Amino acid sequence: YLRLLINPSDSVSLLRILNVPKRGIGKTTVQRLSDAASQLKIPLWEVVNDPEAVRSLAGRSAKGILNFSEIINELQSHLLSSSPAELVQLVLERSGYLNELITAGTDEAEERRRNLQELVNAALQYQEESEDANLEGFLSTAALSSDADNKDTASNRVTLMTLHSSKGLEFSVVCLVGMEQG
């Protein structure tokens, strides 16, 4: 959810969250949306966020997608006015994911809920340590921390990462590859 708020063209993130929690959006519907985006050469979000395109789908799927689009648009409206921790908490509440985990009552759901609370705590810590705390900076810091935790000490290797993730790291050789959608 957080990645999609920062970059609505991130179709991979969109596909991961479109039906989480369950909204009655099936694989066939997702494939039709993806096909339409590919055919029109536009990001998947533009198709998902187009009420006319969505209304042409089956009733339950259309309702789920319209609800999802409404949630994302509301969350994006808070992007500039809310702190990273507030945004994380807002995403958990508005998406319905936190409520789904609470009502599931399983050990796995409880573990996920604790992990999400750690995410909120990490956002709070980031805010305390950063003067101009924003969601994009928090996600970058979290990605760098995660990469550093998993860092392999082998010296003869290639590390693939985004340019944004590489900020502040030192490498003897850096190769930049440009890719554009469409």
Language-model features, listed with the residues they occupy:
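Conserved helicase C-terminal RecA-like lobe
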Residues: 1-182
